[in-house]
Regions:
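Conserved alpha-helical scaffold segments that buttress catalytic/binding sites
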Residues: 10-168
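Short, Lys/Arg-enriched N-terminal segments with co-localized hydrophobic residues
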Residues: 1-8
Length: 168
């Protein structure tokens, strides 16, 4: 009988790979604890599995889970620099925003409401998307909390058009 190390909200540390293989207990970013809210956290991971606004092909909705799965390999410490980010920061994975496929405006509202809650609880939201459209809900939440913001959007291709297939 093997007793697996349980994720602890008291330490906000991912479990040691020597106590539980990295392919076990997958689902949370960096194998961090899951939390119901962002109270007491410095940062909160929030998935936004939405791709209804993608003009080419669907699939970005699988981004948050894909990122979470591969993030199991990330170590919170930098051996060369002797720094463990989790010694200084408290973070957890809050799961996914309750998006509504095919309903863009309702999903914008869900993103805005979720991230407004995270910001009001004092944490910095780190979003895992999702298509480009999720940014609008994120910016609305940030604007509510902090006022005017600027956005620099880096992408691998120039696809931010004013109209696509005759639609604005």
């Amino acid at each position: 009988y093997i007793k697996w190390e349980v994720l602890s909200m008291s330490s906000y540390q991912p479990p040691s790979a020597s106590g539980s293989p990295r392919f076990c207990n997958m689902g949370n970013f960096m194998r961090l604890p899951h939390a119901e809210n962002a109270e007491g956290l410095d940062f909160a991971i929030v998935g936004i599995p939405f791709d209804t606004a993608a003009s080419f092909r669907a699939g970005a909705r699988f981004g948050p889970n894909g990122i979470r799965n591969i993030s199991a390999m990330i170590k919170p410490n930098n051996v060369a620099m002797g720094v463990n980010i989790m010694d200084e920061l408290k973070g957890a994975d809050l799961g996914d925003v309750p998006v509504i496929p095919d309903y863009i405006h309702e999903t914008y509202a869900a993103i805005e409401n979720t991230l407004t809650g995270v910001l009001n609880e004092g944490a910095v939201p780190i979003s895992l998307g999702g298509d480009h459209a999720i940014t609008l809900g994120e910016l609305r939440a940030i604007y509510k909390k902090h006022g005017k913001v600027a956005l620099v959007h880096f992408d691998s291709h120039l696809d931010l058009c004013d109209t696509v297939f005759g639609q604005k």
